[in-house]
Curated annotation (Swiss-Prot):
Main location: mitochondrion
Gene3D superfamilies: Cytochrome Bc1 Complex, Chain C
Name of the protein in its database record: Cytochrome b
Binding site for heme b b566: H89, H188
Cofactor(s) demanded: heme b
Gene (name only): MT-CYB
Length: 372
């Protein structure tokens, strides 16, 4: 595997000549990760992990620290862009059948779990009203686990409710997990270049490969520049576009917000959780909404790797994307009709994709055999 690094540094890493823009999101994710670690380091210098001082320390960063407002907003906005890139990266993998490279796909899924955990811990740190209540609701789901649930929740909280020890350990976890993500990213990249990246056609690219640099590195730079431009546009004109207004108030355990919800990038999983009126069932569905992605390499039935030549699978895929967006939208709304019904329907559609995709693959094989 070390040979891959030597090839990369010496600009000789062979890559398929026909990979499209959808293959640029990996480098964009690495850029986001570096940006998050840099801005996070400067924020950690001024942040105080204490329930009485956390909210004030964030205000101090925004108002008194030179360029603190840039650091804080860059950290928050690039977290959102990070997840946009992650979801596009995963969707690309599903569409082009890249999950058939099992080691890369499963290491990517592990990365996703750590990324979601890191983002959740980070959301709690400002100790705003929504931070506190989102942490209370989500961590309380652990109590649904039989036998061990209550003990695990008490251990995570560091007491019998969310308090100072909870914030301290969340800050420690939020600081250390990005370094775990760096390690996993290195493994992910090494595993990818061990076999080589696939291409939109889903065919073997061994006969037509070109050096990564300068051909694909310049293409990566274009997309990274586009992403950073978008980041600074949001930062300059609407820095609070993706923030929750409720989080501008200090955490108050006495007053419950009218509608508790996590950050927008977790709303799809939260929508699935909320659509099941049973605590244990909802918690299992929440876990399954992410874990089910690991089944993709084992349920692939089509003789064709990519969906590019499979119109029926394409319809199913875009229905899945529409479902994902709809769940996210309904989860941002209060728990009332018609959002309850829409949420339940889209949750069924979400899981149906992973059942229907292998069946459609099998059906398409039969259709192709009939045509031949």
């Amino acid at each position: 595997m070390s040979n891959q690094h030597i090839l990369l540094v010496s600009s000789l890493l062979p890559v398929g000549s026909n990979i499209s823009t959808w293959w640029n999101f990996g480098s964009m994710l690495l850029t986001c990760l570096m940006l998050q670690i840099l801005t996070g380091f400067f924020l950690a210098i001024h942040y105080t992990a204490n329930i009485n001082l956390a909210f004030s320390s964030v205000i101090h960063i925004m108002r008194d620290v030179p360029y603190g407002w840039i650091m804080q907003n860059l950290h928050a906005i690039s977290a959102s862009l990070f997840f946009i890139c992650v979801y596009i990266h995963i969707a690309r993998g599903l569409y082009y059948g890249l999950y058939l490279n099992k080691e890369v796909w499963l290491s990517g899924m592990t990365l996703l779990v750590f990324l979601m955990a890191t983002a959740f811990f980070g959301y709690v740190l400002p100790w705003g009203q929504m931070s506190f209540w989102a942490a209370t609701v989500i961590t309380n789901l652990l109590t649904a686990m039989p036998y061990l649930g209550t003990m695990l929740t008490t251990w995570l909280w560091g007491g019998f409710s969310i308090n100072d020890p909870t914030l301290t350990r969340f800050f420690a976890l939020h600081f250390i997990l990005p370094f775990v993500i760096i390690s996993l990213s290195s493994i992910h990249i090494m595993l990818l270049h061990n076999e080589g990246s696939n291409n939109p056609l889903g065919t073997n690219s061994d006969i037509d490969k070109i050096p990564f640099h300068p051909y694909h590195s310049y293409k990566d730079m274009l997309m990274i520049t586009t992403m950073i431009t978008l980041l600074f546009l949001i930062l300059s004109f609407s820095p609070n576009l993706l923030n929750d207004p409720e989080n501008f108030s200090k955490a108050n355990p006495i007053v419950t917000p009218q509608h508790i919800k996590p950050e927008w990038y977790f709303l799809f999983a939260y929508g699935i959780l909320r659509s099941i009126p049973n605590k244990l069932g909802g918690t299992l569905a929440l876990l399954l909404s992410v874990v089910i992605l690991t089944t993709a390499p084992f349920t692939h039935t089509s003789h064709t790797r990519s969906m590019i030549f499979r119109p029926l699978s394409q319809i199913l895929f875009w229905t899945f994307i529409a479902t994902f967006i709809t769940i996210t939208w309904t989860a941002s709304k209060p728990v009332e009709p018609p959002f309850i019904l829409i949420s339940q329907t889209t949750s069924i559609f979400y899981f149906s994709f992973f059942i229907m995709a292998p069946l459609l693959g099998w059906a398409e094989n039969k259709i192709m055999m009939l045509n031949n």
